[in-house]
Amino acid sequence: MSQDIHAHRILILDFGSQYTQLIARRVREIGVYCEIHPFDMSNEAIIAFAPRGIILAGGPESVHEADSPRAPQAVFDLKVPLFGICYGMQTMAEQMGGKVQGSDVREFGYARVDVVGKARLLDGIEDHVDDDGVLGLDVWMSHGDKVTEMPAGFHILASTPSCPIAAMADDARAYYGVQFHPEVTHTKQGLRILSRFVLDICGCAALWTPSNIVDDAIATVRAQVGSSKVLLGLSGGVDSSVVAALLHKAIGDQLTCVFVDNGLLRLHEGDQVMAMFAENMGVKVIRANAEDKFLGRLAGVADPEEKRKIIGRTFIEVFDEEATKLQDVKFLAQGTIYPDVIESAGAKTGKAHVIKSHHNVGGLPEDMQFELVEPLRELFKDEVRKIGLELGLPYDMVYRHPFPGPGLGVRILGEVKKEYADLLRQADHIFIEELRAFDWYHKTSQAFVVFQPVKSVGVVGDGRRYAWVVALRAVETIDFMTARWAHLPYELLEKVSNRIINEIAGISRVTYDVSSKPPATIEWE
């Protein structure tokens, strides 16, 4: 690798927003390395990090609340470009001598801001121009407070009727603040705004590319594991497949993959995994049949958080059993990625509200015998896919829909039973098969079936059927932080429903989930 891809770096300080790591995703898409650190990062650590620019992210709190987070003094002492987003703008304004007040009109969702001032941040960037020549931007708002008085040196850059200071700028110091969220895809020019800050104002070079990331990850893995052996749980999903390819390239035969058949996998998945990796790629793969153990532990358990933790603990137990058959296994590799971390805690500050735990994050026991290797931990899903292609994995594998670590265990609502898993497997297979036939599989970001533990009356032929209900779920998203339900053709939905009810005797009714994220999550549990 000819260049240090970490040489030009942006520091993102997290105040607890669920969007914080999405900012990092955008900065990396621009091609610049960045790291997220908690808002109370020490002044010494900030100086040592030597960022070319700093982004103050959003957060759920108000600057008026007791003990609400503030930016460290080093943020201002470094005299590097500064960009405050939402709460980041508010605390920046308040700490520099401005004023923040609660807004009579809270803005959540789409808004149009008028660009009423001049500054490098928004120069030449607009969605609309009205008859009077006023530039407008379509943005995403999410705030209850607003800046009412700017610090010395700032001027108004953009405004809305209910938020006169929707953006502020001080070009002399390269300090900027916006009340909207440029990191969210609903802000149409958001990536251009962030690019302007990162590339032009901060002067960063775009060194963060797939080929450089692969080289860096391989070097990091080799430095971490040395000559030790590594175990990887290989599910056949995108994340674990990319990890397998990356580790196989980095350490070769030091890698042993364990495919755990937990009884909660997709139809024919076990055979497909073995064929792809063991036969085609030459990776060492051990197939462990642990269906009885998993289903036995899950019997009688309905709480989704408890199910996740049981699956996580049992997963590690199976690895322990396999590791004892091998010598000198020190590391456990996982396909943990950024969204896993985001939804488990929002970030490291403890300020964000926990939505759900993740199999790769919150369900692992503290006495785990292995050290973790997580080469994808800092990557978003689309970055992982680009890395997979860079490593030579097939397109259809790399762009396969995400599958949760706990598998069908979190797509069966309530208690998990073998009967439910078998029915769900068949229904899910039909849904995916028809999505491909109608050329809708790659138009959706994720699609699956959910088993609902309720029965409904149906009529098949001349007979009455009292059987289970399933729900189809399909979403469209770029970043998995926000998602809308996929507007599938009625003909497709009808075909899927008819096939499921006619071909699977245990199912009598099919529904379609039309919930978006937020407020719903993509998975039901």
Swiss-Prot record:
Catalytic residues as annotated in Swiss-Prot or TrEMBL: 86 (nucleophile), 181, 183
Molecular function GO labels: ATP binding; GMP synthase activity
Pathway where this protein functions: Purine metabolism; GMP biosynthesis; GMP from XMP (L-Gln route): step 1/1
Chemical reaction(s) catalysed: XMP + L-glutamine + ATP + H2O = GMP + L-glutamate + AMP + diphosphate + 2 H(+)
Quaternary organization: Homodimer.
Keywords per UniProt: ATP-binding, Glutamine amidotransferase, GMP biosynthesis, Ligase, Nucleotide-binding, Purine biosynthesis
Protein name from the UniProt record: GMP synthase [glutamine-hydrolyzing]
One cellular component term from this protein's GO annotations in UniProt: cytosol
InterPro entries associated with the record: Class_I_gatase-like, GATASE, GMP_synth_C, GMP_synth_GATase, GMP_synthase, GMPS_ATP_PPase_dom, NAD/GMP_synthase, Rossmann-like_a/b/a_fold
Keyword check for Oxidoreductase: no
Function field: Catalyzes the synthesis of GMP from XMP.
Domain GMPS ATP-PPase: 208-400
Superkingdom of the organism of origin: Bacteria
Binding-site residues, ATP: 235-241
EC number per UniProt: 6.3.5.2
Organism: Pseudomonas aeruginosa (strain UCBPP-PA14)
Taxonomy of the source species: Bacteria, Pseudomonadati, Pseudomonadota, Gammaproteobacteria, Pseudomonadales
Domain Glutamine amidotransferase type-1: 9-207
Listed PANTHER family: GMP SYNTHASE [GLUTAMINE-HYDROLYZING], GMP SYNTHASE-RELATED
